[in-house]
Amino acid sequence: MKRRIVLALLLGVGTLCLSVVGAQESTKVIEVEQLRDNLFVLRGEGGGGNVAVFVTTGGVVVVDSKNPGWGQPILDEIKTLTPNPVTTVINTHSHADHVSGNAAFANTVEFVAHEVTKANMEAMRPYTGRTEPPVNVFEETNGQGLPTRTFTDRMSLGTGRDQIDLYYFGRAHTGGDAWVVFPSLRTLHAGDAFLGKRVPFLDAANGGSGVDIPDTLQKAHDTIENVDTIITGHSTQATWEDLNEWAAFNRDFLEMVRAGRTEGKTVDEIASSWVKPTRYADYDSSNAGSVRRNIQVIVEELE
């Protein structure tokens, strides 16, 4: 079930004489997909990562919260889905397009993340390949929306049909990627540890690793049980077998870089010679910049 809701936010700046000296209209379009009776995915062009909304008997659990300015539209949309209040926000990792909406949620909400993600959110360092830091909404909120509860390896929230299991298997997209499982619904939110079928973004500046990511993905696949559906970070849903294939894709990419180094190739030479294997024909590899950046990350790790 999909529907599109348009939520408009008009920002204006006026002088004392009521003349407008500047105004910006930002239209937030949220698309809602119902995966189960009580589980929804919220998407929105320009809004950042996919949001999961899990309606429990005690309240609503939200996984990730999109870019700056999207928190209130998310809250408004949730009100059309259920009268239950939001009690918990879980962040899969620290990137601004997954956590900035936190700032709009009440201070009664519990914010949960891996301990590394909390540290990354507090620092908000530039991502790998960029010089400017991301927008840090938490500076404006005096820390409101930062994680108030963290975990190291595994943690469970709720019980019975409302239970959520959180896992950490190691470095991947960042150094603190959380895997969020809804056992009763056989569904997992993987965040950007599984972007979708495309070349990954390895943010080494925030703990990501091109050397570790294949093992991390394989551990997730081999450890988590009874999951059929994966909510990806930015794409449509994936299957459990897709995760196994995603791990293989990243392992093959790593071995390709290792082989290139053994042959004495430079980063540019490895990048220009890489050809996507035919078994991954449906993977998006059109971003040559991402391919080169990931090769650079791996080469630096291997040195």
Please provide the spans of the model-predicted regions.
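Metallo-beta-lactamase
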Residues: 59-61, 67-69, 156, 163-252, ...
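Accessory terminal helices/loops
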Residues: 14-24, 222-227, 236-303
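Short catalytic-loop micro-motif centered on adjacent basic/acidic residues
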Residues: 41, 61-64, 87-91, 165-166
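Conserved beta-strand hairpin/beta-sheet module of binuclear metal-dependent hydrolase folds
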Residues: 33-77, 178-182, 186-192
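Extracytoplasmic/secreted envelope proteins and their assembly/folding machinery
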Residues: 51, 71-75, 102, 191, ...
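Active-site HxH/HxHxD metal-binding segment of metal-dependent hydrolases
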Residues: 76-156, 175-177
